[in-house]
Amino acid sequence: MTEKKTWSDRFEGSLHPAIAYFNASIEFDIELIEYDLTGSIAHAKMLAHTGIISETEAQQLVTGLEQIRAEYREGQFNPGIDQEDVHFAVERRLTEIIGDVGKKLHTARSRNDQVGTDIRLYLRDQIDQIRGQIREFQQVLLDHAQNHVETLIPGYTHLQRAQPVSLAHHLLAYFHMAQRDWERLGEIRKRTNISPLGSGALAGTTFPIDRHYSAQLLQFEGVYPNSLDGVSDRDFAIEFLNAASLIMVHLSRLSEEMILWSSQEFSFITLTDSCATGSSIMPQKKNPDVPELIRGKTGRVFGHLQGLLVLMKGLPLAYNKDLQEDKEALFDGVKTVKGCLEAMTILLSEGIKFKTERLTQAVNEDFSNATDVADYLAARGVPFREAYNLVGKVVKTSLAAGKLLKDLTLDQWKELHPAFEADIYEAIAPSQVVAARNSYGGTGFKQVRQAILTAKTLLESN
């Protein structure tokens, strides 16, 4: 590393090569280059707007910065590790292009407020992209729900069959988890979209800058009212990684169900060849690698959140070099969430097929209608707890006899309690069990159809 550092005139000796490499961030903060250029263009225009530099100089700066953007997009600008970070790399290249005027760009600005601006612009953009991905994920869930209102699936508690539900109802649960994710990111976007530009190193600047003008150019909704907070705040990054962790929780839960449902033991879905892999030694295998990877990557995002929390907990005001470590955690968190949302959306849209015959068989081969027998008696005046205890005994007796509730004769029902009539068979039929749960938010078919309309409205309104 022989390049002269921007700050090196303060020092008599040169930086040890290993320390220079250790100190550099260009290998990962190059991710911010587009946002760094955008922020610098706004800063240059503000400097001219306030008379700190001339309009001609500002135009030279903007032209040079746009040239760097074009060079980067065309693969012609690839700063090496000797450049230390993306900010110095851009400034050095700008000076090469337009001469000494390029050295005026950093007037009234520190790397501290510069990187804070860059990372907010980056995250604002990424949040918008992720929210768009969430909408695509929700749409696929909604498409499946519309096709499976009256398809029944066992509902579980403690991973034991509990009550049958509409498959659409089950899928819409994930739709609403995703809706909360979408809304949560929108709230975080507001707190991210505040400009620290003009905070300087920590205390502001002596130049007559207009922070609100540059914020307006960058479409920020406001400016930090405290310069110390402006350069040292990373709440928005922590909030994002928290929201990202919740997105991953929801994707991981769905992934776990996909893994179970695709197993021979459940056999509720079939994985298509486009979204499954095989074994290197067992030729019969079709492995659910996509949901397994999503489930595995969830811990990775959790780790980034915890790492950033621990990073921040002991930092005094204002900027500290520790904050260089925020970027890799944030960048990888963003990349992981985007990749998992894309993979799950593809898996749902073209990677699975529901085995409706198997699902029908599943809801007809257990005692998940037992609660409805108790409800049947309670509706006819029998105290629910008494009815509950009675049905528990019936289930125990039926299990011992190798029978299901639907196999009992009417005489056997009446022996259990005289309130039973011939309509008990209809009451415990799986389709009726589901249809009868017509309370708001329940799995009844009428409620599910209304829930689908509500979900459509949510997607159309944003």
UniProtKB/Swiss-Prot annotation:
It is found in: Cytoplasm. GO terms for biological process: arginine biosynthetic process via ornithine; L-arginine biosynthetic process. The keyword Plastid does not apply. GO terms for molecular function: argininosuccinate lyase activity. It holds the Pfam family Lyase_1. CDD domains: Argininosuccinate_lyase (cd01359). It comes from the Bacteria. InterPro entries: Arg_succ_lyase_C, Argininosuccinate_lyase, Fumarase/histidase_N, Fumarate_lyase_CS, Fumarate_lyase_fam, Fumarate_lyase_N, L-Aspartase-like. Its EC number is 4.3.2.1. SUPFAM superfamilies: L-aspartase-like. Pathway: Amino-acid biosynthesis; L-arginine biosynthesis; L-arginine from L-ornithine and carbamoyl phosphate: step 3/3. Its main location: cytoplasm. It is an enzyme of class 4 (lyase). One of its GO terms (cellular component) is cytosol. It catalyses: 2-(N(omega)-L-arginino)succinate = fumarate + L-arginine. PROSITE patterns: FUMARATE_LYASES. Keywords: Amino-acid biosynthesis, Arginine biosynthesis, Cytoplasm, Lyase. NCBIfam families: argH (TIGR00838). HAMAP family: Arg_succ_lyase (MF_00006). Belongs to the lyase 1 family. Argininosuccinate lyase subfamily. This is Argininosuccinate lyase. The gene is argH.
